[in-house]
Every structure is written in C-alpha cells, then in structure tokens.
C-alpha cells in the first residue's frame, strides 16, 4: 500500500508546489515511486477541464505541470474530487452539501490498491479552505489517516502563531514544517536560534528556505493579462520573467543609475517619458509598461524590437498599474521550467527530510 503524505499550508502561495517538486525528485532518485494529486482542484488550464477528461477525471493544472516536470505517467497523477470555484461553491452552499461525496472513498481505495511508493497530495491554500467540499487539510488528514507537512512563509517570530494553530488542529498528524521565503541574511540566525525554539514547542522543522526573487517572479504575459494591456511589440517574448518593479518618474540621469542596480525589471513610466523609456531599454528590463495618454515614438518601438523587450500599453494610471504588478509578485503558480529546476535545487540545499522519511518508514535520502 502506498504511503500517503499531505503537503499543506496556513495561507495560499506559501510554496507547496516547490516542496512537492523537490521532495518528489529526491524520492524518485531513491527509486521510490511517486504519485501526485490535489483532491481539491484550484487551477484548471481551461474551463472544460472542470468536466473532466480521461474518462471523467479532473486533473489540476499544477498536477499536470508537476507530472510533466517529473516525467510521471498518467496513472501516477491522482484526479481531483472537486473543483474550488465560485460556481461550485454556490451550488454546494444552496444544497447544504458539505461532504466530500463518494469520490473520497474511491480515492482511499485507489491509494490502498497501489502496492508501494508515496502518494503526495497537495491540500488547498489554508487550513480552512475546502471545508465546504469536505476536503480541508484537517479533513483530508483524518479521512486518509495521513501525516502532514506544512510549508509556511516566515516573516518574523509572529509567524509562529499560524503554526501553533495548525498544531492544535492537526495534532500528531503534523509531521513537520518547512519555513519558506525567509530573508536570506536571516537564515543562519533562524537555524541557530529560532529552529531549536520551534522544535521545543513540538514542531519538527524540516527546512529553512530563503526567499527567491525567481520563484516570486511573474511572466510578462501574466502581467499583460492582469493589466489588460495592449502588447505593442515582441509577443514572442512574453515568457520573460519579471523579478522586480521600477517606476520611471525621476530625471533620466537618476533613472539610469537606478536601473543599473536592478535586474529583470518591469519598468512603469508615462507614455510621454521617451527619455526614461530609452534608458530603461538599455538596462536589465524584461518589459516596459507605458501609462497615460499618447503613443510611443517609432524610435522607441524600433529599439524595443531590436533589443527584444516587450512594450505594454495600459489604460490605468501609474499608481494603479504598480498596485496590480505588486500584487502579482509571489501570487502566481509555479508553471515555468526554470522555476521548477530552481525549486528542486532550493529544496535539496535547504531541507532535510530524513526524519520525515524515518517516520514514514521509507529509505533515507543520501546526502
């Protein structure tokens, strides 16, 4: 029978998929068969996926990406039982339906039928998300009698409250936590002082992962979608990753000095600031976002085409544009190959799953 392990979090976009990728890769290298699924789907590639494929199976987009990245066969991808969406939530609420349905028993039977390996199941975004579907983290842990690893962003010592609340709810099923998105310069202090203190509270710390601009980055295509922007050039470069945001509102000399200190930027500036726009194109700029009235000069378009930097034109003012972009950082799915590769490396370098594997009676991972 396959061992089931739940990967959960106290809040959305905590880094669960990154940990799944890293842990699954490590298990695979040890010859352990890995299955992966999300009982409650949260991301679909298109609306038609909500009705299922492969004979009615609903496969979450995150599950598809992880499967493709790890080279998992179709029978190693576990279908979702329900789709988290306003429409399905409304229907269940009106029907006063808060049970997981017969699919949950089918999931248990499916896992029991697998002779060996590990089934990694990614829970919804928070401890309570999924209650309406009978598929919250606590319900899954109890219903499947499965241990839980929590991935939790660590800002400061106040971050412990959410973990203590999770421990109170999950009890002995909480097998360990991974502290994620830690300020890089704070990692040594956390390992030396904070981790021992957390473990004295009964929480096993399996890793301390530094914050990564790459993993928080967003594609130009995603920014264009969120901003409802007009793409003026370089549509074939919308897969570029934006790690930082710069606002071109200063004089051109100050702007050039500022731009030189940044990397992989999205630069937001007024459509009438051609001097700033041209300066930005000469820096580490992934896209140039023009706000306000007016069209860019032909000189700018030609230079952007030459340097293969997408130009976006938006109807929003600069403040609104900046707010939309800042909201996007760290709130996008891990669906790019370069991010997946980096996530695996982060987990390998900053996590030690040996205590967890001992608890699960699996072979220890060689260092």
Walk through the language-model features, giving the residues of each.
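Structural motif
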Residues: 4-5, 33-35, 64, 75, ...
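N-terminal phosphate/diphosphate-binding loop that engages ATP/GTP or pyrophosphate donors
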Residues: 5-10, 14, 18-102, 106, ...
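Ligand-binding beta-strand-loop-alpha-helix segment within the catalytic cores
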Residues: 82-85, 91-99, 196-216
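Flexible, charged surface loops at secondary-structure boundaries
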Residues: 112-115, 256-265, 280-284
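Conserved catalytic-core segment of NTP-binding enzymes
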Residues: 123-203, 272-335
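Non-catalytic interface/targeting segments
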Residues: 208-269, 328-367
């Amino acid at each position: 029978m396959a061992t089931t392990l739940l990967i959960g979090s106290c809040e959305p976009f905590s880094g669960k998929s990154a940990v799944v990728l890293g842990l699954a890769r490590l298990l695979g290298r040890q010859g352990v068969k890995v299955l992966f699924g999300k009982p409650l789907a949260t991301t679909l590639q298109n609306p038609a996926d909500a009705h299922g494929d492969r004979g009615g199976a609903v496969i979450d987009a995150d599950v598809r990406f992880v499967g493709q990245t790890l080279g998992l066969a179709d029978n190693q991808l576990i279908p979702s039982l329900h789709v988290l969406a306003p429409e399905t939530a409304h229907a269940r609420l009106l029907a006063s339906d808060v049970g997981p349905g017969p699919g949950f028993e089918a999931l248990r039977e499916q896992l029991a039928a697998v002779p060996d390996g590990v089934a990694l199941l990614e829970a919804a975004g928070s401890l309570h998300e999924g209650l309406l579907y009978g598929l919250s983290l606590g319900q899954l842990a109890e219903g499947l009698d499965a241990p839980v690893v929590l991935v939790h962003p660590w800002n400061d010592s106040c971050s412990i409250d959410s973990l203590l609340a999770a421990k109170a709810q999950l009890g002995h099923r909480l097998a360990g936590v991974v502290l994620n998105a830690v300020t890089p310069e704070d990692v040594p202090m956390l390992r030396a002082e904070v981790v021992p203190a957390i473990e004295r509270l009964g929480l096993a710390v399996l890793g301390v992962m530094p914050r990564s601009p790459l993993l928080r980055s967003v594609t130009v295509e995603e920014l264009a979608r969120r901003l409802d922007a007009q793409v003026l050039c370089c549509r074939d470069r919308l897969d570029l990753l934006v790690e930082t945001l710069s606002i071109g509102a200063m004089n051109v000399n100050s702007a050039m000095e500022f731009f030189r200190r940044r990397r992989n930027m999205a630069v937001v500036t007024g459509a009438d600031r051609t001097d700033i726009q041209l300066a930005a194109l000469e820096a580490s700029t992934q896209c140039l976002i023009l706000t306000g009235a007016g069209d860019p000069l032909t000189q700018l378009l030609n230079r952007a085409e030459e340097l293969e930097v997408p130009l976006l034109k938006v109807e929003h003012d600069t403040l609104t544009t900046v707010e939309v972009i800042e909201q996007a950082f760290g709130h996008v799915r891990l669906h790019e190959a370069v991010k997946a590769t980096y996530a695996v490396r982060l987990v390998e370098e900053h996590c030690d799953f040996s205590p967890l594997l001992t608890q699960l009676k699996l072979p220890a991972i060689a260092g």
